Amino acid sequence: MDVIKKKHWWQSDQLKWSVIGLLGLLVGYLVVLMYVQGEYLFAIMTLILSSAGLYIFANRKTYAWRYVYPGLAGMGLFVLFPLVCTIAIAFTNYSSTNQLTFERAQQVLMDRSYQAGKTYNFGLYPAGDEWQLALTDGETGKHYLSGAFSFGGEQKLQLKETDALPGGERANLRIITQNRLALNQITAVLPDESKVVMSSLRQFSGTRPLYTLADDGLLTNNQSGVKYRPNNDSGYYQSINADGSWGDEKLSPGYTVTIGAKNFTRVFTDEGIQKPFFAIFVWTVVFSVLTVVLTVAVGMVLACLVQWEALKGKAIYRVLLILPYAVPSFISILIFKGLFNQSFGEINMMLSALFGIKPAWFSDPNTARAMVIIVNTWLGYPYMMILCMGLLKAIPDDLYEASAMDGAGPFQNFFKITLPLLIKPLTPLMIASFAFNFNNFVLIQLLTNGGPDRLGTTTPAGYTDLLVSYTYRIAFEGGGGQDFGLAAAIATLIFLLVGALAIVNLKATRMKFD
């Protein structure tokens, strides 16, 4: 007789579908909310990932995908989505001056005002737990007084003409300063229906909107009479001449527009960007190659030494040599920054005492680059040493015994047996190390911050900058504003370069070993 296993309440289909339905409603609400806020990419990403997840976990036929989905979702969320966003930004003028939408930039301009009409001296007088606002016309000497009010939010105060000011003690400057934000939200309406607002800590003035918006989108400056029209090529309201051509004046803030491949064109045509870009690209490749070669060479030699049978105290040497790998890299980098200090660093003190020289590690381009490679070799060799120590165990001792019978020495054994047998399994890891060092932002940012700086460039660039740190400086340290669009274009080029170099390296090594 078959035994029917009773399900617990938390295993019931009704509960499962109820939870899935609630999650679906929640996701739908979030997607609509993102769409309404204009976050279209986030809305699409949330819709795709959540829909796929609900389908996989609700359908028994996709049971095997439940183990793969978290990894795929993580890759999509943290790798593919940022990549798509970066590429999308690269085709816009998104920057510190062009962050807003057209509607928001237009509203900011329409909210601006200028001082027009009379200026009145004002005072605050206590009225129990509330206050009264008093205005005095400096030309006629007339006084105007409001009813009692409390601070908080936007409000209009109707003022009436009065013969004398209240007899209480007038609020001092400290009280006015403390309530300045609340006073800025007050509009005082005079008996003739004219309106004045706070213009300084002691005065209220009449104001008018600085710009008037026409039905055709034309913006007119009410002070100067200059007319502006939105220029969707540059993302600014730009002045227009009498003949309808564009003038030189642009109104800030601008708005974000799609500009096509202009950012990519700037990289290759603007000499202020082109020269440092290609120079930095060459240095980035050289830095990555030298780092891989030196870390592998040092790590392999040290691995062979600590595996030497005749060496005593091998365990102690292994621990000491692995220490640079155990210490967090950012701590080691900052320590080396102090050691290489040109005036007080221990390295220059030793070089001065022994050889009478004090290299300019941070101001000379060549010595700065040498310092970067030295520090990165120190940080990277323990990883390669650990890999080589494991791979050396796989080399049969018979090969070394046979070479000893032929009279081969240690150097011949290393170059004829050890090196060829280690290089093949190390190749994929060397390619990964090359890709990592191609984007080694932390080292450059903490050690040299890209310096020494290059002269004659339109973007901030230094002699030790890698492409990734150069991109960061364009995005966040630009003197003329943070140019996120240009930085995204360079980041896209870096992605394509690293991908192309990795493919070329993999194909080259495959052809070599086949």
UniProtKB/Swiss-Prot annotation:
Its main location: membrane. One of its GO terms (molecular function) is ABC-type maltose transporter activity. Gene3D superfamilies: D-maltodextrin-binding protein, MBP (2.40.430.10), MalF N-terminal region-like (3.10.650.10), MetI-like (1.10.3720.10). One of its GO terms (cellular component) is maltose transport complex. The chain crosses the membrane at residues 17-36, 40-57, 70-92, 284-306, 319-341, 370-392, 413-435, 484-506. Residues 37-39, 93-283, 342-369, 436-483 are periplasmic. SUPFAM superfamilies: MalF N-terminal region-like, MetI-like. One of its GO terms (biological process) is maltodextrin transmembrane transport. Residues 1-16, 58-69, 307-318, 393-412, 507-514 are cytoplasmic. Residues 281-505 form the ABC transmembrane type-1 domain. It is a multi-pass membrane protein. It holds the Pfam family BPD_transp_1. Keywords: Cell inner membrane, Cell membrane, Membrane, Sugar transport, Transmembrane, Transmembrane helix, Transport. It is found in: Cell inner membrane. The complex is composed of two ATP-binding proteins (MalK), two transmembrane proteins (MalG and MalF) and a solute-binding protein (MalE). Part of the ABC transporter complex MalEFGK involved in maltose/maltodextrin import. Probably responsible for the translocation of the substrate across the membrane. Belongs to the binding-protein-dependent transport system permease family. MalFG subfamily. This is Maltose/maltodextrin transport system permease protein MalF. It comes from Salmonella typhi. The lineage of its organism: Bacteria, Pseudomonadati, Pseudomonadota, Gammaproteobacteria, Enterobacterales.
